[in-house]
Every structure is written in C-alpha cells, then in structure tokens.
Amino acid sequence: MNFNKVLVLLAVIFAVFAGQTEAGWLKKIGKKIERVGQHTRDATIQTIGVAQQAANVAATLKG
C-alpha cells in the first residue's frame, strides 16, 4: 500500500519536472514519427494507383 503511494508521488514529481524541461528531444522524435507516417501514406497512395492501373489493364484485356 505504501509502495503505491510512493510510486504515485514519484510519478507526480516526474510529471512536474518533465513539463518544465525543453521538449527538444521529444519534438525530434515526433518529427521522425510524422515523417515515417507521411512516407507510409505516400507509398500507400502510389500502391493503390498502380493496383488500379493493373486492374484496368486486366479488365481491358478481358474484354
């Protein structure tokens, strides 16, 4: 029971100090994650376009 109280107290202290520090490292990580998401989105859009073209070719050949 006391361990939980100490753990909560440490979490609150950490949250207070973490909120006051510069978010430089967190911002860098966020930008990297955002860039990965953008690349994934772009690759998905390109793949869908290629698949649609392939389906059109197949439909044209089928008659």
UniProtKB/Swiss-Prot annotation:
Give GO cellular component annotations, separated by semicolons: extracellular space
Task: List locations, semicolon-separated.
Answer: Secreted
Q: In terms of domain of life, where is this protein from?
A: Eukaryota
Q: Which residues carry this modification: Lysine amide?
A: K62
| InterPro entries from the UniProt entry | Cecropin, Cecropin_insect
Query: What are the entry keywords?
Result: Amidation, Antibiotic, Antimicrobial, Immunity, Innate immunity, Secreted, Signal
The answer on whether this UniProt entry bears the keyword Secreted reads yes
Q: Point out the signal peptide segment.
A: 1-21
Coarse class of the primary localization is: secreted
For whether the record's keyword set contains Signal, the answer is yes
Q: Which family does it belong to?
A: Belongs to the cecropin family.
Query: Which protein, by its recorded name, is this?
Result: Cecropin-2
| Taxonomy of the source species | Eukaryota, Metazoa, Ecdysozoa, Arthropoda, Hexapoda
Q: Which gene encodes it?
A: CEC2
